[in-house]
């Protein structure tokens, strides 16, 4: 008996909708990363993009535990002298909640070219409405 190897044509992609209202940022990001990579499937293969599409709604209503709103910092640098910028998580959640969720999920995805393909299947929206409601095989996840 030979070992079954997954081919790119064998992969079937579903759509998962995750409602982030009232849920913790890390919990939502971990669930999204699991579905994006395909680790929930019995045919998981590390060298192929076998994951599903993930839609995260209500990004504005996400919560964090502890004092992270005031203490967790996000850093960036423009590359120019004096171009170092830092922002608190609380400020970013008010202005760019989509970036916060995408950044958290990106940290849980492999850092290679396959990771870029995987991350392209993530869709994040501030409100409850999203344009992917008509996709076939939409699976609603609520934890």
Curated annotation (Swiss-Prot):
Q: Name the Gene Ontology biological process terms.
A: negative regulation of translation; translation
- Which is an annotated GO molecular function term of this record? mRNA binding
Question: SUPFAM superfamilies in the record, alphabetically?
Answer: Ribosomal protein L13
Listed under GO cellular component are: cytosolic large ribosomal subunit
Question: What's in the keyword line of the UniProt record?
Answer: Ribonucleoprotein, Ribosomal protein
Under Pfam families, the record lists: Ribosomal_L13
Assembly and interaction partners: Part of the 50S ribosomal subunit.
Entry similarity comment: Belongs to the universal ribosomal protein uL13 family.
Check the record and name the NCBIfam families matching this protein. rplM_bact
Please give the function described in this protein's UniProt entry.
This protein is one of the early assembly proteins of the 50S ribosomal subunit, although it is not seen to bind rRNA by itself. It is important during the early stages of 50S assembly.
Q: What is this protein called?
A: Large ribosomal subunit protein uL13
Question: In which organism is this protein found?
Answer: Dehalococcoides mccartyi (strain CBDB1)
- Gene that encodes the chain: rplM
């Amino acid at each position: 008996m030979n070992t079954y190897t997954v081919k790119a044509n064998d992969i079937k992609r579903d759509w998962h909708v995750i409602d982030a209202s009232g849920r913790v940022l890390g919990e939502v990001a971990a669930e999204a990363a699991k579905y994006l990579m395909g680790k929930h499937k019995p045919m998981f293969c590390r060298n192929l993009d076998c994951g599903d599409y993930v839609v995260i709604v209500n990004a504005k209503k996400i919560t964090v535990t502890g004092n992270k709103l005031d203490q967790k910092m996000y850093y960036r640098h423009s590359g120019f002298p004096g171009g170092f910028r830092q922002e608190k998580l609380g400020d970013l959640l008010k202005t760019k909640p989509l970036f916060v969720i995408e950044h958290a999920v990106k940290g849980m995805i492999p850092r290679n070219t396959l990771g870029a393909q995987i991350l392209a299947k993530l869709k994040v929206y501030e409100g409850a409405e999203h344009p992917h409601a008509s996709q076939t095989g939409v699976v609603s996840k609520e934890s």
